[in-house]
């Protein structure tokens, strides 16, 4: 445990003296954060986007333009399966065994890993590069297609069902797996050898199962959640910023 030294809306005050900065807002908030943070960052700091969703590419360009010597990294996902339920309240449903971390450029990985070591209870898995980590973020696969497949249920039931269980039937999971095969094919075209969404969840949560459907049904971290509306980050973030 640790005491929170400062809570502030002043970004310059928050960044002053920080060795490592973790940015955990949705992808559609990245640019606004970069615009505010880059002028306040200091040489030698480390900034980690959690997750990256290709944001490190834009951040590195902004830092280069500003003449800042800051280490940049990203993860493929958050260390926790969690969601904000109301202002000031977060429901953490599970903790991942490991998330993938990559630096940009990739050669900075050792310095980044040393800076973030021990910061979270989860482990770090070394990513080949930030393209690999961004394409390993499987939210675009496991969220977008099921949102469309469950559109009627989301609108009629307003979140009162199990999205990852009842909403991801064998047929819906086959649709997810078809989308996943496209993701893996695009990755191979870039020379990347990524694992399937099912294997990603096996690695992250330690669950077992032959198919994606089996893996989802066996994961207690996915219990008790469903979007209440189609205007949800599963579509507004995962479709334009990942897919």
Q: What residues fall within each predicted segment?
A:
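Conserved N-terminal Rossmann-fold NAD(P) cofactor-binding segment
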Residues: 1-18
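Short acidic/histidine-rich motifs immediately flanking catalytic phosphotransfer sites
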Residues: 15-21, 42-44
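Short, well-ordered coil/turn residues at beta-beta hairpins
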Residues: 17, 23-26, 50, 119
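Rossmann-like NAD(P)(H) cofactor-binding subdomain of soluble oxidoreductases
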Residues: 27-88
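Generic structural signal for well-ordered, non-membrane alpha-helical segments
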Residues: 56, 109-113, 172-180, 205, ...
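Substrate/ligand-engaging "lid" and interaction regions
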Residues: 79, 84-179
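Small-residue-rich helix-loop
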Residues: 172, 179-219
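Long, low-complexity C-terminal extensions of enzymes
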Residues: 200-207, 213-243
């Amino acid at each position: 445990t640790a005491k929170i030294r400062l809570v502030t809306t002043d970004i310059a005050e928050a960044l002053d003296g920080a060795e490592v900065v973790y940015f955990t807002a949705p992808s559609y908030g990245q640019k606004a954060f970069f615009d505010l943070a880059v002028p306040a960052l200091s040489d030698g700091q480390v900034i980690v986007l959690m997750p990256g969703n290709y944001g490190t590419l834009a951040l590195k360009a902004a830092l280069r333009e500003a003449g800042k010597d800051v280490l940049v990294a990203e993860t493929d996902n958050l260390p926790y399966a969690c969601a904000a339920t109301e202002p000031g309240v977060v429901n953490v449903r599970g903790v991942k065994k490991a998330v993938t971390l990559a630096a940009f450029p990739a050669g900075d990985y050792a310095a980044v890993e040393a800076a973030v070591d021990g910061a979270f209870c989860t482990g770090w898995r070394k990513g080949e590069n930030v393209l690999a980590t961004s394409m390993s973020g499987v939210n675009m696969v496991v969220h977008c297609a099921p949102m469309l497949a469950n559109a009627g249920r989301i609108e009629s039931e307003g979140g009162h069902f199990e999205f990852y269980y009842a909403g991801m039937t064998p047929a819906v999971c086959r649709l997810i797996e078809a989308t996943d095969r496209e993701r893996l094919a695009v990755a191979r075209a870039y020379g990347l050898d990524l694992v399937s969404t099912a294997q990603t969840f096996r690695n992250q949560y330690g669950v077992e199962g032959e198919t994606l459907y089996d893996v989802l049904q066996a994961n207690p971290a996915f219990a008790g959640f469903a979007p209440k509306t189609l205007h949800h980050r599963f579509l507004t973030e995962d479709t334009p910023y990942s897919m």
